[in-house]
Amino acid sequence: MNTGSAIISIESELAAIVGREYLRESASVLARHAIDGVVPEYVVEPGTEDEVAALVRLANERKLTLYPEGGRTGQVGRTPPRVDIVLVTTRLNTIEHYDPGDLTIGVAAGASVLSVREAVAANNQLLPVEVAHPAPSTIGGVLARAAYGPLRHGYGPLRDSCLGLRFVTGDGRLAKSGGRVVKNVAGYDLMKLLIGSHGTLAVITAANLKVYPAPQQTRTFVADFASLSEAIAFRDTVVRSPLTPMCLEIASPLAQEFFSSHSDRQTWRVMLRAGGSDAVTARYARDLGSAVTHVFEAQAEEQYWNSVIDFGERVSARHQNAMVVALSVAPSELQHAIEVAERVANENNLLVACSGRCAIAALNLAFIPMPQGAPVVTQYAQALTRLRESLAPDAACVVTRCADQVKQHVDVWGATATDVDAMRAVKRALDGNDVLNRGRFVL
């Protein structure tokens, strides 16, 4: 895009693919689709998979960068060097098939999480996908990020609920992996490479997903403890027991201030959500006994879990300069990881709120400046460095939210993966010219 004629040519080619009305060029629209402040040259909204393939093919041939986008609700990654094209998937929003008897549903990537939830709920079924903004969030975006919420404990990671994907590779080829039903999923599981690859290997265009019978009823049991060690001991007791909760969460005293209901005491909280018949929930009440300090059900329960899911959003709304980190460690290392986070926060004049899945040890850590106001960038950089240095080598520590000026001084992803050669080989095979999401992910 060095000359005026080249720009006119690209505009014409983009418009020929999607139609002039779906080529967005106004300054205000382009600004709304900026990525970490980097404004795109063009925003396009394809309506079919063929249009997606044609757009990626054009970008590949013209050596342009292309960034897939869903509902803009969970963008994570490094600041891109430049953004030529943002490809918005929200016009690809159909439910292609739904078979309640087989517990499967096929949806286009731009379908909203809310619309799919509502479709399966009409048949008393459940899609275990939880995001802070289900109306704008898209299925493709959730898959690209491998996003999950509290239901991850009971239903497993999202990749286990994905039966098949259709996608467009970095050179514009339409492809698929997996199938429509469980028995058809065989061979090399390429789709599991795409889930969580943040759009750097391919543009996801459609997905076949497993759904689950919705529980007859749910009830949430809350246990408050004076110390972190007591909360971890309770977690261990639950994990060793016959109980199989849908959700099993932990929250620090500060994290609870962002929930819809919290204790006024400085206590650590463990939350279990049980689903099933009256007999099942009665079993939980009996087995948990005096450890339970609160019980939520019906509307109060829904409000409570929505606030837990919205934790990162609520922190950012109240503290715009906060830094939120997604942390994953071995379950046996959870207490140590939290204690390290609290120590490095204190050393750098920060507060830290912890909330997340305590059985699988996947947490959100919200670092908040103290006193309130704009933090010194070095505070966050030093805290993040010390946190990563103090954790096991296999721990994952990813910055999911921070101010732009902070991102310029920290590595969002952390240390380069040990299997980087294999990752580069996959990238070369699917996106050899580095068209997709350039500069955003670990490679």
Task: Label every model-predicted segment.
Residues 1-22, 26-27:
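A charged N-terminal "starter" segment
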Residues 49, 227-229, 274-281, 330-334, ...:
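Helix N-cap motif at beta-to-alpha junctions
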Residues 2-4, 39, 64, 71, ...:
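Conserved glycine-rich FAD pyrophosphate-binding loop
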Residues 20-35, 66-68:
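N-terminal glycine-rich anion-binding loops that anchor highly charged ligand groups
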Residues 103, 266-275, 359-368:
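A generic structural motif
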Residues 14, 33-66, 83-85, 89-133, ...:
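N-terminal glycine-rich flavin-associated loop
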Residues 144, 163-321:
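C-terminal substrate-binding/cap subdomain adjacent to the FAD-binding core in PCMH-type
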Residues 33-36, 75-81, 260-263:
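Short glycine-biased active-site loop of nucleotidyltransferases that positions the nucleotide triphosphate
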